[in-house]
Structures are given as C-alpha cells and as structure tokens.
Amino acid sequence: MTTLACQKLAPHPESPRHQHAGPWLVWLHGLLGSGQDWLPVAQLCGDYPSLLIDLPGHGQSVSLSADGFADISRQLSQTLQANGIREYWLAGYSLGGRIAIYHACYGRHHGLQGLLVEGGNLGLENAELRQARLQQDRQWAQRFRQEPLPQVLDDWYQQAVFADLDPQQREQLVLLRADNHGTAVAEMLEATSLGHQPWLLPALQRLNVPYTYLCGDRDHKFLQLAQQYRLPLHTLARAGHNAHRANPGAFAAQVLAFLSQSSCLPPSSLSR
C-alpha cells in the first residue's frame, strides 16, 4: 500500500463537527506545490476537518512516484483509507483538479460527497493535440531535470496562464517553488501530462455527486473553458489562475456556500 504524506486539520473547537466524525475536506495542490498551499483556505473552512495531501514528487511525498492517473487515484484511495476517512469532499487546483476529476469519474471513490475543481483542464479531445502536448511536457521535463530550478521557474511562470502575475508576484513564486526537486517534478509532469489524460467531460457530466468549477475572474483560459462546456462556474474576484492563493477569503466563502447548498440538494438535483 502506498500512502501519500498529508496533514490533518481538526475542526474548530466550537464547530458542531468537532466531536463528531463528519465529511472531510480533502485538498489536492497543483504542480510545484504542496498541501501547505491550501492551509489558509482550509483554516477558513474550519467547521470541517481537512486533509492536506502532498502529491507524488512534492512536499513530504517527494520520494514517491506515480505511473499515471490511475496509479495516483489508487494512492489517494489508500491514503484516505489509512487515515480513516470514509466520507469526504474532494477539492483540487490545476493538476490537483485534474486528478480530482479523474478520481471522481474513474477511481475508487466510495464515500465521495462532491467535487470542487479550481482551474482544472478536462483534457484534449483528439490524438493530435494529445501528442503535441506530450512533446511539450517532455521538453519542460528535460529542462526540470537538467537546468537550475530557478532558471526553469523563471520561464515557467512566463506562460500565458500566469499572465495576470506582476514581476514581483512571479519572483515570489519562483522563490517559493525553488525548494522542489527538479527530477521529481519532471517525473510527475510526464506521468500526468494532458497527453496522457483522458477526455473527462462526458464522465464528469454523468457524475452522481454535486460538483462545481471555481475560477479567478482574470483566468481567461479557464473561464472560457468553463463557459464553453457549461460547467457550474463560480468566479473569484481579483484573481487569476491560482485564485485560492490570490483571494483565500473569497475562495473559502465559495467552498462553504457550495457545501451548504449541496448538502441540502435532493439526489435528483446532484451535479446539475
């Protein structure tokens, strides 16, 4: 059994859930991040117990690897089992969002109450696009393996999806992410390339649990994606691709509103 490194946060002492085992919030970070990225939001959602997970190749799971989405989904299931988590809401950002969707659609997800995705890509619809993305990600992976990490990160955060960042914010992210291990990042990047990811929209639309899609109002790429595929979209003000970092208070408010609303929905209304 492979279990991922994680941190548990108990509910606030005054929370009605403090003495009772209820659904957990399970948080999956993006590439180059760690479970700690979610700490400000998780603390603001303190009525719920939280599990902050370090994905393979990241944080305290840096020595772990994964052989694609199915393997990571199995590792997630084993981690939940090892921590005694039977009912949970799954939230993921970017790479973590893609893993969360895959797990909800294809993994062993008994006990899953609902899904919250921030800026997660649904995949690529044809083989030509997938092959092109594989080649692109392999080039990035080669750089992560061979070049000084700050140098690669400088270029990484110049990508169009991070266009809302100013120079100071880019510099802060480069410093924050520079403690990663380039080889471990490269392996995870290749294992979870969009070129390997299935097209998730049809399975997502068939989910029998509620789900929502969260996006910064400056994240034009993923706003367009959510609107194009008519996802249940909620936007975060003054935020780009990493909305939970830019505006944790608004993000936590959206999470709590979704949990409250979804807990009151009849089964026939789920994920609609």
UniProtKB/Swiss-Prot annotation:
Record bears the keyword Nucleus: no
Listed GO MF terms: 2-succinyl-6-hydroxy-2,4-cyclohexadiene-1-carboxylate synthase activity
EC number: 4.2.99.20
Any Pfam family matching the protein: Abhydrolase_6
Classification via InterPro entries: AB_hydrolase_1, AB_hydrolase_fold, SHCHC_synthase_MenH
Keyword Ribonucleoprotein set for record: no
GO process terms (BP): menaquinone biosynthetic process
Coiled-coil positions: none
Family matches, as SUPFAM superfamilies: alpha/beta-Hydrolases
Pathway: Quinol/quinone metabolism; 1,4-dihydroxy-2-naphthoate biosynthesis; 1,4-dihydroxy-2-naphthoate from chorismate: step 3/7; Quinol/quinone metabolism; menaquinone biosynthesis
Keyword entries, A-Z: Lyase, Menaquinone biosynthesis
Catalysed reaction, written as an equation: 5-enolpyruvoyl-6-hydroxy-2-succinyl-cyclohex-3-ene-1-carboxylate = (1R,6R)-6-hydroxy-2-succinyl-cyclohexa-2,4-diene-1-carboxylate + pyruvate
Cited NCBIfam families: menH_SHCHC, PRK11126.1
Role: Catalyzes a proton abstraction reaction that results in 2,5-elimination of pyruvate from 2-succinyl-5-enolpyruvyl-6-hydroxy-3-cyclohexene-1-carboxylate (SEPHCHC) and the formation of 2-succinyl-6-hydroxy-2,4-cyclohexadiene-1-carboxylate (SHCHC).
Oligomeric form and interacting partners: Monomer.
Family statement drawn from the similarity comment of this UniProt entry: Belongs to the AB hydrolase superfamily. MenH family.
Protein name (database record): 2-succinyl-6-hydroxy-2,4-cyclohexadiene-1-carboxylate synthase
Originating gene: menH
